[in-house]
From Swiss-Prot:
Its EC number is 4.2.1.19. One of its GO terms (cellular component) is cytoplasm. The keyword Kinase does not apply. GO terms for biological process: L-histidine biosynthetic process. NCBIfam families: PRK00951.1-5, PRK00951.2-1, PRK00951.2-4, PRK00951.2-5, PRK00951.2-6. Pfam families: IGPD. Belongs to the imidazoleglycerol-phosphate dehydratase family. This is Imidazoleglycerol-phosphate dehydratase.
Amino acid sequence: MSRKAVIERITKETQIKLSLNIDGSGEARVCTSVPFLDHMLNLFARHGLFDLEVEAKGDIDIDFHHTVEDIGIVLGEALKQALGDKQGIRRYGQATVPMDETLASVAVDLSGRPYLVYNVRLPKVKIGEFDVELAREFFQALTNNLAANLHINVMYGDNVHHILEACFKALARALDQATQQDPRIAGVMSTKGKL
């Protein structure tokens, strides 16, 4: 079974085309006009072993908010579509990732119930032109559209770049684990019989 998706989203604010292969090798081609987000999505693909292509244009002359949030929406939709009925997947994943002085942990449940817990303290600063508060908007949009329960916790860290990079890497590794198919699982990993 091919676990791939291609999603296109066109609004008055953004134009996004995204293709995803869950069972990839970590190849990425990302061009969002938001350099820091490009960096995060490239490492997300690499560390999750997802093949990911993203082309995005947005009203970045205003700010990056719409573009960042809409990419989160589309990535969530693509993951959900590629997983289909979730037959045989592990459902749960978790990863703890160090990045120099930072330690971040992510746990995910592909339950069909969207809920984000975001314990990440960041000063209101920019990395380049990227407002770091937009990271939460991205994760919330991803969570809602994937319909997943996502917990992101940063135990400690000082460098804002390192904090967000550790979060994206931990998310990638947790999703890689949760989306893996296990031959021991008949149907879905739920006593209800549906996720």
